[in-house]
Amino acid sequence: AAELAAAVLWCALTLGTDWLFFRYDWRTPAFFVYKALFLVLAFGLVHGAVTLVQKLRAGDKFARRWVAWTLPYLAVNLVILLIVWPGIWGNDDLAVLYLARTLQPNSWQHFLTSGAFILSLMFVPMPGGVVLVQNLLISGIVGCFAATAQDLAEKRLTRPVRPAWFALVYLPFLLPPVLMHTQQPFRTTWSTWTELNMEFMLVAMYLRGTKLNNK
């Protein structure tokens, strides 16, 4: 109940902060749809944060590893974002951003891109907010990769591996093209990381012997 109340309060606060970026008509159906989606995401974020804190306090090994691997990569991305603030924008990105101010979708760039922009901007109501949210998500994904690799190695290998070796997971994600792509709020960035995360999850489930059904 407390988590839901916090999410509702957060959603209510956005009614006062949206003016920093948006110029929408609250009487349109789009307003209610996006606020409902924001409420769901806010609840998920609050619940996730509470759960993470509980796991860290309980000494959960995977949670601690995830935080330990996420923060260094996030720090690198935030330094780069600070240098290129508010991100690396192209004409297509700006077209989506322009329509997002009035909660309109850019059909040419797919409505999911517009949805990601609008919801990100409700969390952080400035153009750079889209890139900031993107950086947080991507850093969390890379942290999950490293933590999962360490977890799998510990369970599947007979000889222990020093934790420092798992820093090698960072290498492909520290290449300049990848770091620069992370600062570009384009649909290919969102779709690429979504696909990569899904593929990694499937591989991890396979290596863990997780079954999707009883067959």
Regions found by a protein language model. Give the residues of each.
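Transmembrane signal-anchor helices characteristic of membrane glycosylation enzymes that use polyprenol
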Residues: E3-W19, Y34-F43, H47, A63-W89
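Aromatic- and kink-enriched transmembrane "portal" helix at the membrane-lumen/periplasm boundary
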Residues: F21-R27, F111-S114, P127, V131, ...
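Alpha-helical transmembrane segments of polytopic membrane proteins
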Residues: R27-F43, V130-N135
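Hydrophobic core segments of transmembrane alpha-helices in multi-pass, intramembrane catalytic enzymes
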Residues: F38-A42, A95-V96, T113, I138, ...
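Transmembrane and membrane-interface helices of multi-pass
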Residues: P72-L74, L152, L157-V178
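Specific aromatic-rich, kink-prone transmembrane helix
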Residues: R101, C144-A147, W190-G209
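Transmembrane-helix motifs of polytopic, lipid-linked glycan transferases
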Residues: L132-L157
